[in-house]
Amino acid sequence: MSVISMKQLLEAGVHFGHQTRRWNPKMAPYIFTERNGIYIIDLQQTVEKLEQAYEFVKKLAMEGGTILFVGTKKQAQDSIKEEAERCGMFYVNQRWLGGTLTNFKTIRGRIQRLKELKKMEEDGTFDVLPKKEVIKLRKEKERLQKFLGGIENMESLPSALFIVDPKKEAIAVAEARSLEIPIVAIVDTNCDPELIDYPIPGNDDAIRAVKLITSKIADAVIEGNQGEQFAASEE
């Protein structure tokens, strides 16, 4: 039983690539044809590549690994958050803060600050502070929550990244590569698939297409976690 059907991919518009003038020649092997100035992605390869990515993610989760879901473009923000939360993983869906991986210690410091501010709000500290001070602290907390909320409980570097549009998330790609963290990504016809360990050729601009593929990666995590629990109960 394959992870995904051609019918599902077609219905979600995964086959629509970018305009022919906006392409990366390295994507040529994944292009089926050109229609009305738009490249059409070869969905048979999408099925195959998604299966490879699924197996990788499932195995990783089974071994207790973590995945960081990354997608900051409008079309990806909701899916990235929803699917990462559904499978109990971490996410970045606002802005990728430079150094999120390569300067993780500093980022952990900012997360610590976020936790402190939340505690102050909960334990009544805000009630005894001057109003002006509280407004300032609340603003700081909201900003930190916006950018770091999805990685608040990420205690160590992730085992892998799942990225929607690695061209847009070039900094995340560069950081992961420098730390040799494997990358799974949806690669559209304007991306460089050679930078990605598990490229999944597909439309990264349609909400439905992004949701479909992201949900499959989350399913792989869930299936892997069930395997991990099963293995633990067998011991």
Curated annotation (Swiss-Prot):
Transmembrane segments: none
UniProt keyword terms in alphabetical order: Ribonucleoprotein, Ribosomal protein
Gene Ontology biological-process annotations: translation
GO cellular component: cytosolic small ribosomal subunit
InterPro entries attached to this UniProt entry: Ribosomal_uS2, Ribosomal_uS2_bac/mit/plastid, Ribosomal_uS2_CS, Ribosomal_uS2_flav_dom_sf
CDD domains according to UniProt: RPS2
Single GO term (MF): structural constituent of ribosome
Superkingdom: Bacteria
Entries under NCBIfam families matching the protein: rpsB_bact
PANTHER family noted in UniProt: 30S RIBOSOMAL PROTEIN S2 PROKARYOTIC AND ORGANELLAR, SMALL RIBOSOMAL SUBUNIT PROTEIN US2M
Family: Belongs to the universal ribosomal protein uS2 family.
The protein's name: Small ribosomal subunit protein uS2
Species name: Thermoanaerobacter pseudethanolicus (strain ATCC 33223 / 39E)
Gene: rpsB
